[in-house]
Amino acid sequence: MEDSEPERKRARADEATAGGSRSEDEDEDDEDYVPYVPLRQRRQLLLQKLLQRRRKGATEEEQQDSGSEPRGDEDDIPLGPQSNVSLLDQHQHLKEKAEARKESAKEKQLKEEEKILESVAEGRALMSVKEMAKGITYDDPIKTSWTPPRYVLSMSEERHERVRKKYHILVEGDGIPPPIKSFKEMKFPAAILRGLKKKGILHPTPIQIQGIPTILSGRDMIGIAFTGSGKTLVFTLPVIMFCLEQEKRLPFSKREGPYGLIICPSRELARQTHGILEYYCRLLQEDSSPLLRCALCIGGMSVKEQMETIRHGVHMMVATPGRLMDLLQKKMVSLDICRYLALDEADRMIDMGFEGDIRTIFSYFKGQRQTLLFSATMPKKIQNFAKSALVKPVTINVGRAGAASLDVIQEVEYVKEEAKMVYLLECLQKTPPPVLIFAEKKADVDAIHEYLLLKGVEAVAIHGGKDQEERTKAIEAFREGKKDVLVATDVASKGLDFPAIQHVINYDMPEEIENYVHRIGRTGRSGNTGIATTFINKACDESVLMDLKALLLEAKQKVPPVLQVLHCGDESMLDIGGERGCAFCGGLGHRITDCPKLEAMQTKQVSNIGRKDYLAHSSMDF
């Protein structure tokens, strides 16, 4: 018994030691233990890691594209004092980094704008369907018999550049003809020189100094100059000379012609241009030159009268797109021998929906023609598109395209909607008559006209809703001084010339800044000074007011307090890529990315989806 007791104690001791060693092993196992993670959870974790890696890679690529180094730990400089780096150096380093980021933002903006311009650019060239279908292209401009005087040709290119710099003439193109500073040196006949003198035109304006020699040389041209700078003479005098040359070589027979064609966007402008051509043709005839016939083809007039001139053979024709297309389709007019085409206020015609009509008119030409485009406002988008119709064109720009005339004093006043009519009478007292009043809506024109008549003011009104006879009588009465005030919509703002006007009143702000430039350009013409008063209020679109503010600053005019408070964010972003403002509409207060005109056009296009009639023009519906 005594022997078994120690054995039992030993066994307990062994169990105790064994238990102790087991607990130590268990502790070690606890330390090495990895908890079990379900398969789904493991997959989610792996996916998260992959996404993080991909994001990191993408941000590095973006930073490389923008030209900045990938941000690492060394970029995260703690703000505050650092060892071996002065606060000035630290400030300079941070400033450089901020400028680098700003530059990348500008580059990004430019890329975005290029994409937008490409998307809105017209895919088809401004050519006839026949020319595009047959792949007809012309490499060389039309040859003419005119050459500059020998001594002008012998002058150096440096001298020509000095003349252009003196008159602020910007030219683009190859083989540009030299600028000529007098009408006599341009080889015009004595009768035309006398006619110019009678009108008080003694020296050519900057656009005429470079433009007339360019056209007489037979070159295609885009002419951009501020309102009242004499653009009409640039394309009317050369066409008279070309037609006179053709008539002397071989007289025009019955139903032949025209040789020269001028297209205008409005009837009033066409009538005015026709009057200028008639004046110089009459002077040439009095000076024993052959009779040159000029036809006026506009809507609202009897076709019979127009055909009477055409039947005898016509040298020149001034027309509006609608009536000209009608006569061409009815085969009453032929453009077989036409070699000279001028589009006055070209950007408005292309922009205002006449583009299809212009293409159709182009398809009636049988050979190469000399094409000229003129306007006071021509955004980059229109210039690029128009160049597709020209052969080695010369672009002549006097001042910025769309800039206001510096001879006009611009006054902008905040007037409540209900107070406009009463304040209008006060504004009429600023200058002696004649005065021109513009309004956007036809109803406003009629209301202003009626109010002025009730107050005893001698006023006339024109807008698209009135018939042609009434419009013509109103303009003639105003031009002759029988009436003191002309109230009109924008139909009278394009190209019309009323020499004595000292004051233009904008009853409302137009929806596009281009129309504002054309409106105020009716005064301050031919070197005279004029005043333009514009009423603005809360109803005006802010983007147009921003453009107006920029236009006033550019012309060094007084900016009213109501416009001074307007800000468009980062002003430096308005002037990037070597061009200020919007490339689509020409406004200075915004870029193409924020253009309200482009936005309105895109909205209209979207709303027209599904409504378009896909039947061809004049086709039968079977």
UniProtKB/Swiss-Prot annotation:
<feature type="cross-link" description="Glycyl lysine isopeptide (Lys-Gly) (interchain with G-Cter in ubiquitin)">
    <location>
        <position position="9"/>
    </location>
</feature>
<dbReference type="GO" id="GO:0045944">
    <property type="term" value="P:positive regulation of transcription by RNA polymerase II"/>
</dbReference>
<dbReference type="GO" id="GO:0071013">
    <property type="term" value="C:catalytic step 2 spliceosome"/>
</dbReference>
<feature type="zinc finger region" description="CCHC-type">
    <location>
        <begin position="580"/>
        <end position="597"/>
    </location>
</feature>
<keyword id="KW-0747">Spliceosome</keyword>
<feature type="domain" description="Helicase C-terminal">
    <location>
        <begin position="407"/>
        <end position="567"/>
    </location>
</feature>
<feature type="short sequence motif" description="DEAD box">
    <location>
        <begin position="344"/>
        <end position="347"/>
    </location>
</feature>
<feature type="modified residue" description="Phosphoserine">
    <location>
        <position position="21"/>
    </location>
</feature>
<feature type="modified residue" description="Phosphotyrosine">
    <location>
        <position position="414"/>
    </location>
</feature>
<keyword id="KW-0963">Cytoplasm</keyword>
<dbReference type="GO" id="GO:0008270">
    <property type="term" value="F:zinc ion binding"/>
</dbReference>
<dbReference type="GO" id="GO:0005783">
    <property type="term" value="C:endoplasmic reticulum"/>
</dbReference>
<dbReference type="InterPro" id="IPR027417">
    <property type="entry name" value="P-loop_NTPase"/>
</dbReference>
<dbReference type="GO" id="GO:0140896">
    <property type="term" value="P:cGAS/STING signaling pathway"/>
</dbReference>
<dbReference type="GO" id="GO:0030154">
    <property type="term" value="P:cell differentiation"/>
</dbReference>
<feature type="modified residue" description="N6-acetyllysine">
    <location>
        <position position="9"/>
    </location>
</feature>
<dbReference type="InterPro" id="IPR011545">
    <property type="entry name" value="DEAD/DEAH_box_helicase_dom"/>
</dbReference>
<feature type="region of interest" description="Disordered">
    <location>
        <begin position="51"/>
        <end position="84"/>
    </location>
</feature>
<keyword id="KW-0597">Phosphoprotein</keyword>
<feature type="short sequence motif" description="Q motif">
    <location>
        <begin position="181"/>
        <end position="209"/>
    </location>
</feature>
<dbReference type="GO" id="GO:0005634">
    <property type="term" value="C:nucleus"/>
</dbReference>
<feature type="modified residue" description="Phosphotyrosine">
    <location>
        <position position="33"/>
    </location>
</feature>
<dbReference type="GO" id="GO:0051607">
    <property type="term" value="P:defense response to virus"/>
</dbReference>
<dbReference type="InterPro" id="IPR014014">
    <property type="entry name" value="RNA_helicase_DEAD_Q_motif"/>
</dbReference>
<keyword id="KW-0067">ATP-binding</keyword>
<dbReference type="GO" id="GO:0005524">
    <property type="term" value="F:ATP binding"/>
</dbReference>
<keyword id="KW-0539">Nucleus</keyword>
<keyword id="KW-0547">Nucleotide-binding</keyword>
<keyword id="KW-0347">Helicase</keyword>
<dbReference type="GO" id="GO:0035458">
    <property type="term" value="P:cellular response to interferon-beta"/>
</dbReference>
<protein>
    <recommendedName>
        <fullName>Probable ATP-dependent RNA helicase DDX41</fullName>
        <ecNumber>3.6.4.13</ecNumber>
    </recommendedName>
</protein>
<dbReference type="Pfam" id="PF00271">
    <property type="entry name" value="Helicase_C"/>
</dbReference>
<feature type="domain" description="Helicase ATP-binding">
    <location>
        <begin position="212"/>
        <end position="396"/>
    </location>
</feature>
<feature type="compositionally biased region" description="Basic and acidic residues">
    <location>
        <begin position="1"/>
        <end position="15"/>
    </location>
</feature>
<keyword id="KW-0863">Zinc-finger</keyword>
<dbReference type="GO" id="GO:0008283">
    <property type="term" value="P:cell population proliferation"/>
</dbReference>
<feature type="modified residue" description="Phosphoserine">
    <location>
        <position position="4"/>
    </location>
</feature>
<dbReference type="Pfam" id="PF00270">
    <property type="entry name" value="DEAD"/>
</dbReference>
<dbReference type="GO" id="GO:0003724">
    <property type="term" value="F:RNA helicase activity"/>
</dbReference>
<dbReference type="InterPro" id="IPR001650">
    <property type="entry name" value="Helicase_C-like"/>
</dbReference>
<feature type="modified residue" description="Phosphoserine">
    <location>
        <position position="23"/>
    </location>
</feature>
<feature type="compositionally biased region" description="Acidic residues">
    <location>
        <begin position="24"/>
        <end position="33"/>
    </location>
</feature>
